[in-house]
Amino acid sequence: MGGWLPKPRKGMGTNLSVPNPLGFFPDHQLDPAFGANSNNPDWDFNPIKDHWPQANQVGVGAFGPGFTPPHGGVLGWSPQAQGTLTTVPAVPPPASANRQSGRQPTPISPPLRDSHPQAIKWNSPAFHQALQDPRVKGLYFPAGGSSSGTVSPVPNIASHISSISSRTGDPAPTMENITSGFLGPLLVLQAGFFLLTRILTIPQSLDSWWTSLNFLGGSPVCLGQNSQSPTSNHSPTSCPPICPGYRWMCLRRFIIFLFILLLCLIFLLVLLDYQGMLPVCPLIPGSTTTSTGPCRTCTTPAQGNSMFPSCCCTKPTDGNCTCIPIPSSWAFAKYLWEWASVRFSWLSLLVPFVQWFVGLSPTVWLSVIWMMWYWGPRLYNILSPFIPLLPIFFCLWVYI
């Protein structure tokens, strides 16, 4: 086996110059142990197998374009598996000779006297005479109303009809009322969810701005990835829990949350102060405190039954409580300024400068315009996370 054979080769594989890309033996046998190079090389009795020289033909085949395997491919011996694409026309279905299997024609309608015998009774003179009965008219024309005259209905029938209408109550709500009742809460929920998702992005945006201050001119990279717990390259604003920078990220976001709450509280105090609803008592002229005695509550309002709260201050004369009304606006701001001026005397030196600066209104406006033009884009990047808070502040301003 494997030596030179004097017999000429028979069957497939005679042309040994053809390459053998998939490892077939020249005699088209898969293994020498099954009779390769023997007297019976054609041991695989495939009646429709193709010959080896046809492998040089360009075809689609099961092994890709350009090669048709000798055995017909792994998909079988069909023409499609050997790369021969044929189009078989679709045979139309035979016409049905049975007309009864299709749709039947609509049968002729029976006469009205057979299908609706009650209609014949409605058209009878006896039926029209029955309609003229006062008891029957009371059902169709209550309260004596009639097209032919005033007819008093039977009392028991009318009372029965009224009792039925009283039990039924109001008519069923229309689809328009139901839709309007559901549409409002859905819009409020959608707007609230949108504002909530936008507000939750504020800490991350402020955290990115905070960390960018430490990487001026470069991209922020977490320094914890070079420590004993190596992690992949990531931003310091998205540290995983195993990163040492995770605790610093949580601390920064906690400080940012406190800052946002403080900002909302300041806005609420300013709003309540502007509407005169903060119980802040102004300083008594000539004193540094708001009360000089034990009285700190006020039992009666300053000006009648006012809805705004009042502040109770004590007179230094007889010690009786006197309710002093809160100023209409900016009482809290005035109180803070007076309190700070008492504690820090150097703030009083700024008053003339502020008054002089405010008096130069054209200069102030031009300065503000110039600063916004120069610092506007940078301020927008800093203040853009706070834009979702503006609708909340607006709602508080309108409804409080």
From Swiss-Prot:
Residues 2-253, 203-253, 370-375 are intravirion. Keywords: Acetylation, Caveolin-mediated endocytosis of virus by host, Fusion of virus membrane with host endosomal membrane, Fusion of virus membrane with host membrane, Glycoprotein, Host-virus interaction, Lipoprotein, Membrane, Myristate, Transmembrane, Transmembrane helix, Viral attachment to host cell, Viral envelope protein, Viral penetration into host cytoplasm, Virion, Virus endocytosis by host, Virus entry into host cell. Glycans are attached at residue 320. Residues 120-174 are annotated as: Pre-S2. Isoform M is N-terminally acetylated by host at a ratio of 90%, and N-glycosylated by host at the pre-S2 region. Myristoylated. Residues 97-106 have a biased composition (Polar residues). It comes from the Viruses. Residues 2-119 are annotated as: Pre-S1. A lipid is attached at residue 2 (N-myristoyl glycine). Li-HBsAg interacts with capsid protein and with HDV Large delta antigen. Isoform M associates with host chaperone CANX through its pre-S2 N glycan. This association may be essential for M proper secretion. The large envelope protein exists in two topological conformations, one which is termed 'external' or Le-HBsAg and the other 'internal' or Li-HBsAg. In its external conformation the protein attaches the virus to cell receptors and thereby initiating infection. This interaction determines the species specificity and liver tropism. This attachment induces virion internalization predominantly through caveolin-mediated endocytosis. The large envelope protein also assures fusion between virion membrane and endosomal membrane. This is Large envelope protein.
